[in-house]
Each structure stands twice: as C-alpha cells, then as structure tokens.
Design a protein with these regions (language model features):
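Structural/interface elements that position substrates and couple domains in central-metabolism enzymes
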Residues: 2-325
Length: 325
C-alpha cells in the first residue's frame, strides 16, 4: 500500500496504471465531507466548485441550516459566496444524516476537529474515530475514506482496523490520508489552487480516484507527493512545527538583540533575503496562537514521547516554552 515518490510526478504507483484506472471510471465520484467547520465547509465548497456533487455532514443542525443558506459561522473571504452559489445550483447540500452521505457518496473526506485533550497534550481523536466508523457502517457500496484532519502519526492505521471491523457484508473500503495545508484568510484559494497535494497509503485504485478528484489543480502543475500513511500524517504537523520553531527562534534572537543593542527587525530582513530562510514568520514579539499551532506541536510532543523520539520532544518543548514566556 505504501510508496515513495518524487514531488515532480507524485506517483509511487505506476503512472500508466493510474491513468488506465482513471480512464476506466465512467462517472465522476460523488463526495461527502464529514465535519463542516473551517476545514470541512471550505473543502465541500471547493469540491463543488471543481464540478462534483457534494454532501456536507455535521452533527449540529443549526450549522447545517446556516450553511444551507450560505451563512458561514466564521470569517473566510469568498467562502459564503461560493457555498451559496453551489447550494443554489444543487451541487452542494448539507445534512445531519451521515447514513445518507454514506449511502449516496463514493469518496468520504473526514474533516472533523482533533482538539487537545483536557488536561493533556494529546489530541482528542474521538471525533475522527466516530466519524470514520459511522461512514464505514453506512456504506451501501465500495468507497474510499480520505482523512484530512490533522492527526498523530499512527492514527490512520488504527482507523483501517476500525473500518475493517464494521463494514457491511460485501462492501469494501480503504482509508487513505490527504492532509490539508490551509492558511486563514486564504483557505478557498489554498484548496482550489494548492501548492502541493499529498496522498498517503494509496494503491492504484485509490490514487486514481484522488487524482480524478484533484484533476483540476494537478492539470495546472500542482505537485503530487504519494507516500506511506505515517509520512502523510506527519507532513502537516511537521510543517506547523517548523513554522512554530521559526517564530520562537526569532523571539529568542530578539532577546539577544535587545541585550546587545541590535535591531531585530533589520536582522530579520537580512535573514529573509536568504532564500533558504525567507522572511515569513520572522516578526519578533508576536508569539504563535490560534487553533492549530499550539495544539499541533503539543500533540506532536506527546506522540513523539510515546514513540521514544526524545530529541523531537525536547525541541518542541523549547519552542513551546519560548512562545509562552
């Protein structure tokens, strides 16, 4: 199931085999998106914009009602208009009925939250596990379950076991991973025109399906990286950990600049001209916050400690401590 590939062509699977599998598909896959928060609502709208019939699923009836009217409970430029356009066209609908989505759809994106556990650095995976289980139980035909939520490494393998235990007789489904890389304020653009696409744990059939789903950005040159499940799970959290490290680095250097009489802003500008470093995330004084970076590096610390990767734990502890100072 796992494979490694260069970013240039994205396929550890034989490209001719993938192309043949895509060609053999008679109709576009129908898509469900489980969870309609920031990630899910954006992904559902973008999939509809790419020409797919999409069902967005959420357990909150008030959220489903609002989205069905094009009202988005958070700020993201362009998203309300995109949702309303495709709700009115009939291409996008929202429901609380996950069984309906499972029965009617072919590709199921898991986009539920993975908050930090109360009193722990670990990620709360109950929403991901429940959503995946319910989708698998409701399948009326063979399907593909695609994780997009940010999860600790090893989660997808466990989800495969859960799915295998609850699938209806005669139905098959695989679990693969396709992490998101959204920036607040640019989520619609980042979904429609991503700077890279990662597929984790795909075989010929599942990769062909995902390449059909993402055919539009792939056709414009977006690189595809096809890899094993653990690598795909680690890509997003590692990216966030690196950005957090960059922020904590410049804040640590800011202390040195203050002690030495140096100008940290000028120093950051000078560093930024080095294309190996870049200027982004080098603004001293502003620590990282929000809903992703803090919880993601703490979940990474927790999982790294479970796996005995103590240097990663130590590095992330320093990053977190500098940020909290």
């Amino acid at each position: 199931m796992s494979k490694n590939t260069s970013p240039a062509d994205g396929a550890g699977t034989d490209p001719q085999s993938v192309d043949a599998a895509v060609t053999s598909a008679s109709t576009k896959p129908r898509i469900s998106v489980i969870g309609t928060g920031y990630l899910g609502a954006t992904h559902a709208a973008a999939m509809a914009e790419m020409g797919f019939d999409v069902i967005g699923v959420d357990t909150d009836p008030s959220k489903v009602e609002a989205l069905s009217q094009g009202r988005v409970p958070f700020f993201e430029p362009g998203l309300p208009e995109l949702i309303l356009r495709h709700v009115e066209s009939g291409r996008l609908l929202f429901t609380t009925d996950i069984a309906e989505a499972g029965a009617l759809s072919d590709v199921h994106f898991i986009c539920v939250g993975t908050p930090q556990r109360r009193g722990s650095h670990a990620a709360n995976l109950s929403y991901v596990e429940e959503a995946t289980r319910k989708v698998a139980e409701s399948l009326s035909h063979d399907g593909l379950i695609v994780g997009k939520s940010t999860v600790p490494v090893g989660t997808a393998a466990r989800l495969r076991e859960i799915v295998a235990g609850v699938l209806p007789a005669g139905v098959s489904a695989d679990v693969v991973w396709n992490p998101e890389f959204l920036r607040e304020g640019h989520a619609v653009e980042d979904t429609l025109r991503p700077d890279r696409i990662v597929f984790g744990g795909t075989d010929v059939r599942s990769e062909a399906i995902l390449r059909e789903v993402y055919a539009e950005p792939i056709s414009t040159g977006t690189p595809v990286i096809s890899c094993d499940l653990p690598t795909a799970e680690l890509v997003k959290v590692s990216a966030n950990a690196f950005l957090a490290t960059k922020i904590s680095f410049i804040n640590a250097i800011s202390e040195l600049c203050e002690a030495a009489g140096a100008n940290v802003s000028t120093l950051a500008d000078a560093l930024g001209f080095d294309d190996r470093i870049g200027r982004k995330f080098l603004n001293a004084g502003l620590g990282f916050g929000g809903g992703c970076l803090p919880k993601d590096i703490r979940a990474l610390m927790f999982r790294a400690n479970e796996l005995g990767a103590h240097r990663a734990v130590g590095l992330m502890q320093q990053v977190d401590e500098i940020n909290m100072a």
